[in-house]
Each structure stands twice: as C-alpha cells, then as structure tokens.
UniProtKB/Swiss-Prot annotation:
<keyword id="KW-0949">S-adenosyl-L-methionine</keyword>
<dbReference type="InterPro" id="IPR007848">
    <property type="entry name" value="Small_mtfrase_dom"/>
</dbReference>
<dbReference type="GO" id="GO:0005737">
    <property type="term" value="C:cytoplasm"/>
</dbReference>
<keyword id="KW-0489">Methyltransferase</keyword>
<dbReference type="Pfam" id="PF05175">
    <property type="entry name" value="MTS"/>
</dbReference>
<comment type="similarity">
    <text>Belongs to the methyltransferase superfamily. RlmG family.</text>
</comment>
<keyword id="KW-0808">Transferase</keyword>
<keyword id="KW-0698">rRNA processing</keyword>
<comment type="function">
    <text>Specifically methylates the guanine in position 1835 (m2G1835) of 23S rRNA.</text>
</comment>
<dbReference type="InterPro" id="IPR046977">
    <property type="entry name" value="RsmC/RlmG"/>
</dbReference>
<dbReference type="InterPro" id="IPR029063">
    <property type="entry name" value="SAM-dependent_MTases_sf"/>
</dbReference>
<dbReference type="InterPro" id="IPR017237">
    <property type="entry name" value="rRNA_m2G-MeTrfase_RlmG"/>
</dbReference>
<dbReference type="InterPro" id="IPR002052">
    <property type="entry name" value="DNA_methylase_N6_adenine_CS"/>
</dbReference>
<keyword id="KW-0963">Cytoplasm</keyword>
<dbReference type="GO" id="GO:0052916">
    <property type="term" value="F:23S rRNA (guanine(1835)-N(2))-methyltransferase activity"/>
</dbReference>
<dbReference type="GO" id="GO:0003676">
    <property type="term" value="F:nucleic acid binding"/>
</dbReference>
<protein>
    <recommendedName>
        <fullName>Ribosomal RNA large subunit methyltransferase G</fullName>
        <ecNumber>2.1.1.174</ecNumber>
    </recommendedName>
</protein>
Amino acid sequence: MSHVDDGFRSLTLKRFPQTDDVNPLLAWEAADEYLLQQLDETEIRGPVLILNDTFGALSCALAEHSPYSIGDSYLSELGTRENLRHNGIAESSVMFLDSTADYPQAPGVVLIKVPKTLALLEQQLRALRKVVTAQTRIIAGAKARDIHTSTLELFEKVLGPTTTTLAWKKARLINCTFSNPQLADAPQTLSWKLEDTGWTIHNHANVFSRTGLDIGARFFMQHLPENLEGEIVDLGCGNGVIGLSLLAKNPQANVVFVDESPMAVDSSRLNVETNMPEAFERCEFMINNALSGVEPYRFNAVFCNPPFHQKHALTDNIAWEMFHHARRCLKINGELYIVANRHLDYFHKLKKIFGNCATIATNNKFVILKAVKPGRRR
C-alpha cells in the first residue's frame, strides 16, 4: 500500500493482486503524477478518457469528472475499483470500457499510460482517431526508458503533431494534437498458420506472442495429455492455442478458456469458431482474475503458462494466485500442469501449495510440471 498526493486529492493506493509487504511494488508511478500535474481543473471540458490506468491512480484522482477508464486488463479494473472503495469514492464515478468498445465522442482530455505492447497502443490510437477533435488535449506518460522513437512516430502517424517533455523523476510525457493525418487502414487482428495443424490463429492487438507461436507454448503442446474427461481449464489462455490442442486431443472433455484480457478471451473464442467450430459447444470463455468466484472441486485438470510480469513490472504474484486458485477449483486427484522458464523455480512453489510436484518434461529453457490435488473433499 502506498500514499500519493497528486494535487487533486490525497490517495492511498495498493496493487492488485496485493504484493507482499517485504518488498512491495508501488501502485502508482511518477508518470501518473506527471500527467496530473499538467491538468488545471479549469481546463477540463468534455469527457475525460483514461487509457491503461494500471491500478486507478488517475481514475481516483479525477473521479469527480466521471472519467472513462479504458483498457484491456480485468485486473486493472478490479484494482481501480478496490482503490476507489478504499478511498471512499463511489465506484460509479468511473465508467469502465474495454479497448474494443466504442470510445465516447469529442473528449476534452485524453490521458494515456503508454502500454507495454506497441500493437495495443496503435489499436487504441486508431480508436481515439475516430472520436477526438483538434481541441482535445492528448497527453501520454511512461517511464522515460519506455518511450522510444517508434512510440513518438506512432502518435505522429495516427493522430498528428507530437512533442515530448523533459524527464521528471525518470518519467516523460508525450503531447499530441489531433490533425487528422492521412492514414491507411490496417488490420488490428494478426493471423498466421500454425504448422502441423491446418489451423489459422487469430490474435487481437494485446495478445501475448501475437506474431507467432511462443516457444514455451510449443514445448507445452508437445506434452499435453490425452483421453481427459470432464471440465478442464486453459488458465491464462492468451490466443487459446493450448485450449485448442486440448479440445483436439480430448474429445470427451469440455474446455474453459480463462484470461484477464478481454482481447485474449475474444481471440480464443474466434480461434475455436474458425478452427474447430464443431467443438464450440464444448467450450466456455471467461474474463476473470484467475479462477476467482469459481466453485471449488469443479475441474479435472488445469493447464497454465503463467506470466511473470504485470505490465512493466516483474512479479510472481499472479502465478502464485493462479496456483492457489487451481488447487481450490480442482477435484480431488485433479491435476495442474504448467510450463515455465526453468529459472523461476516453480517446482518448490507447487510442492508447497499441493504437497507434491513432478517434472513431466524439460529442455534447456523450459520445464513442464504437474501437481495433483491430494486429500479428501470436505
């Protein structure tokens, strides 16, 4: 938990999921402060759009202006909602939209936290292009090291004249004025053939490894079990290639695709519809924080390629939460399979949570682990 006084109000903010208290990561950064410093409240005219507000620092500070919070992270939405409540601000003060929704017309102010993925930034800028005016104040912010020439060129190409500020507390801002430059249409969904399958994999802008199959998933697919029955989960599904493979290998199983990214879940849905339409009735698609709210003892197996970063921050908190949720939601003798970089040492984490862990396969970079839920149902 951390405190910030941004000039609009004094806030107490925390990350979501909460980091440990030994070495906590902050729920806000200098770029949030820098963005808010640029706004004189008398200048705010028309709707306020906030893009990629990680844990609500901007939304909480500007809540009295009823801002729209736009992004592709359900975790960020949950974190923002929790910080609104914690600071005594009504959740209804902020309107939440995912990045694929239509943006409000003629905004007065647009604040953008520059996302890690340039493809997501382009998708968002193209969406803004349809609604902003020459009078809209457009300001983006990030750590100085995360603003590159390619970032500035993208703003210039999609929206118009772009300048940057000096660094402040290692953060920089981008100021942009909309001039409606000529811009060719470009597909924001990328597709490629997955070798040895006949499948075409479709990837929306914010999907991990959208330009091709990542090597961890490739290794995982080589070792997926067959002849499973009941409900199984592709947890953190991304574009759904693991779930697709499970559908093909396990015709008696139903697959639940889960991710905190609406774009990932929609990509998974699209990939089942276009590649295995006959199996669509065996699928469920869920935008969720891991398996929050899912009943215990539901699943026969969970498959997971857990992330070890949240936005720009390295953290194992999300993976740790996924493992705990999997244990709760597995049936007795249900199995959790994960693929991960070897250096992350998830073997001991799984053994601590499940009481057991076995290595299924390993190579020079990745390891596939299996843990089994022990005990009797209470």
